Amino acid sequence: MEERAAILLLAHGTPDSAEEIPEYLRNVVSGRPMPAEVIEEVRHRFVEIGGSPLTALTLQQGRLLQEALGLPVYVGMRNWKPYIADVVKQMVEDGITRAVAICLAPQNSRTSVGLYRRAVFAEAGQKMQIGFIEGWAEDDLLAAAFADRLRATWEPFRAEVGGPVPVLFTAHSVPCRTVQAPQPDPEAPRRPVLPPDPYNYEAKKTAMHVAAKVDGLDAWYFAFQSQGMSGGPWIGPTVEDTLTALHQEGIRHLVIQPVGFLCDHVEILYDIDIAFRDFAQNLGMMLRRPASLNDSPLLTAALARLAQSGLDRLQASEAPEPAAS
């Protein structure tokens, strides 16, 4: 059989219309009941921004990566079409024998990378060799891509203000239970205990790497955004609490830079551009956001390097053992 390689990009997914939001949310929470008021709020946000461009932008990122690599690039979504299972099935039908899967959530977490990984391997089985990129929060080209966007907003804003302008880095919050270290089960003492989830640490490491690439940055802070509207507690500090604290310290101008998202979608276009901006304005603060990475050449370069590295590892794992001398 002829060996054929490809790349698989994995993302969260978004519905195509407001009418599909209830079904989409059922996928997000694995079929658990969702309060009607939560469904209505999500629908409101979706409509307010004119629909989410996440799928279209992710497909564009795939096309750019395909041009850079000269290899087929597929895109699969966990919570909406094109579903990961359907895309992996198509890859097998297309004769793909090995692939590198890259989760477009750079910071590793059991709620992102772990779920995507299970979805890919559940369908691929033994039909295709998969190399999975576990997390790339500290990738130098990723940091350079964010820094490039940040610089383009922060420098002119600082010149306009005529004084210091701090930066607030953000990443999507996750449930507290996700990142808490599991405790040994006294009823099953031999059951292995998973290590703490790395997400909290990795999100802040990304921010640190981005900040280091922007010369003269006045100060920077970190918060978790877009906490869930139902369920138990989610990790913080929240953006709202952080904005309030910074206002009390006398800060009136701020750049907010999300570092966990690679393209525009609801959490940027609504949560940041509408909700957080209105919240800041009510405090008497001016908030600006850099452009999202979307079609950033540096992001394409980062993905290409990750993909090639993954392909090289797959190739090496297939290489025969050297003959004994």
UniProtKB/Swiss-Prot annotation:
GO biological process: heme biosynthetic process
Localization: Cytoplasm
Residue sites binding Fe cation per the record: H172, E267
Keyword Iron belongs to the record: yes
Function: Catalyzes the ferrous insertion into protoporphyrin IX.
CDD domains: Ferrochelatase_C, Ferrochelatase_N
Pathway: Porphyrin-containing compound metabolism; protoheme biosynthesis; protoheme from protoporphyrin-IX: step 1/1
A single cellular component GO annotation: cytoplasm
Protein name per its UniProtKB record: Ferrochelatase
Name of the gene: hemH
Highest rank taxon of the organism: Bacteria
Species in which this protein is naturally found: Acidobacterium capsulatum (strain ATCC 51196 / DSM 11244 / BCRC 80197 / JCM 7670 / NBRC 15755 / NCIMB 13165 / 161)
